Amino acid sequence: MKIIGILGIQGDIEEHEIAVKKINCIPKRIRSVSDLDEIDALIIPGGESTTIGKLMVKYGFIEKIRNLDIPILGTCAGMVLLSKGTGKEQPLLKILNVTIKRNAYGSQKDSFEKEIILDGKKLNAVFIRAPMVDKILEKTVEIISKDGESIVGVREGNIMAISFHPELSNDGIILYEYFLKNFVEKN
């Protein structure tokens, strides 16, 4: 069985652990840099990107994650952290060739659910203070999901990033299965 780590320093950690179990993988909460050596893939969860970034710096995660050669999925704040920039000064991994507009859909009270398409399948996506891709910086970045004209899902190499929270959706398992099939099992 594949072991999928969930960065466990802030954010929707438990919900991702439940989803990982549903796709017959073993979840591992990542609390220290050494935990990263024991996983086949990594999920960087939603939460507060500035807080997660500062904690990643404090505990030495930035360089280690930048040098990982495993699939990485970033959801919501995780998408922000993977990006090259946000227009705001904050710690970022800078390993995904996109810039991000933070809180593109508004505040917490503007949260919503909307049906999107991922890999030809309908998925009810939960957007909470969600970011969106502002600009694609390299042709190696592939759009995998949109909300109208807004880009809400991308992939580049072994990195996948989405604006929404699949761990909070009844059919979010579709996204985890996509990540497993197209990233984790191919690594």
Curated annotation (Swiss-Prot):
List UniProt keywords, sorted A-Z.
Glutamine amidotransferase, Hydrolase, Lyase, Pyridoxal phosphate
Cystine residue pairs: none
Which pathway does the database say it acts in? Answer: Cofactor biosynthesis; pyridoxal 5'-phosphate biosynthesis
Q: What is this protein called?
A: Pyridoxal 5'-phosphate synthase subunit PdxT
Query: Which Gene Ontology terms cover its molecular function?
Result: glutaminase activity; pyridoxal 5'-phosphate synthase (glutamine hydrolysing) activity
The terms describing its cellular component in GO are: cytosol; glutaminase complex
What's the family? Belongs to the glutaminase PdxT/SNO family.
Tell me how this protein assembles: In the presence of PdxS, forms a dodecamer of heterodimers. Only shows activity in the heterodimer.
Whether Hydrolase counts among this entry's keywords is yes
Positions that bind L-glutamine: 47-49, 102, 128-129
On the tree of life, the source organism's domain of life is: Archaea
Q: What is this protein for, i.e. what is its function?
A: Catalyzes the hydrolysis of glutamine to glutamate and ammonia as part of the biosynthesis of pyridoxal 5'-phosphate. The resulting ammonia molecule is channeled to the active site of PdxS.
Known catalysed reaction(s)? Answer: aldehydo-D-ribose 5-phosphate + D-glyceraldehyde 3-phosphate + L-glutamine = pyridoxal 5'-phosphate + L-glutamate + phosphate + 3 H2O + H(+); L-glutamine + H2O = L-glutamate + NH4(+)
Name of the gene this protein is made from? pdxT
Q: Which InterPro entries match?
A: Class_I_gatase-like (IPR029062), PdxT/SNO (IPR002161), PdxT/SNO_CS (IPR021196)
Q: Which PANTHER family match?
A: PYRIDOXAL 5'-PHOSPHATE SYNTHASE SUBUNIT SNO, PYRIDOXAL 5'-PHOSPHATE SYNTHASE SUBUNIT SNO1-RELATED
Q: What is its EC number?
A: 4.3.3.6, 3.5.1.2
Which GO BP terms, alphabetically?
Answer: glutamine catabolic process; pyridoxal phosphate biosynthetic process; pyridoxine metabolic process
Write out the catalytic residues in the record. 76, 165, 167
